[in-house]
Amino acid sequence: EDLKKVEVYISQNENPSLQELNGIIGKIEESNTPITRAAAAYDYSKYLPVSEGQLNSKEKQIFNQNPAAGLIVLAQADYANKSEKGVFGSNSWGTNGDAYRHALWNAMGAKGVGDSYMAAFATAHETGSAGYNPNSIDTQMDLKNNAKGRELLKSMKFPSRPPNGMTIPYIIRNEIAKAVANGKMVRFVSGGKQYSYLMPTNSSSKN
């Protein structure tokens, strides 16, 4: 809904300022309000949040620092969720696909909103989650893959004049997939079995 408002405003106003866009979107309630039924039913181990109602309290704080950037981050989360399913056949936890999803989200998000905001949002996604444990294997995995996605973006080469709007996402997606296949990310599930340590990702394309 907020994204539609922004699209309409941009279509009617040439070069709107960030302040104007943030004014249209507005901030979201940060207090610990009861979790909505939709958010409670959302599987955070297999999907990234794609709407304001699915954010934890720490993510909401980062969102409210720059709501326009926050919407971009949520849109890229949706892109990463769908891309994992398209590439690996499903959305999953602890696998190559999970590593791909987090790294892609961070690379795409950093491309859209800058490294520091994306890093803050992605870290809040982990530290603000229910039952957060900094030493848990899944937290360690996500933080490492988030950082790797942002790091890889810095070495990617993009055309100065992309032929169309899908060129840059295509380049980022391919580079992240290549990095996963080449063992640049980490996971703890292999062949359907869960391990107690992190291991490099590999070229297996099925979750």
Where are these regions (language model features)?
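Structural recognition of the beta-strand scaffold that forms the well-ordered cores
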Residues: 107, 119-123, 145-147
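Small-polar-interrupted transmembrane alpha-helices in polytopic inner-membrane proteins
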Residues: 115-131
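Interfacial helix-loop-helix junctions of multi-pass membrane proteins
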Residues: 126-143
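Glycine-rich short-loop/terminal segments
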Residues: 1-118, 201-207
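Active-site or metal-binding loop neighborhoods of secreted/extracellular toxin and effector enzymes
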Residues: 143-207
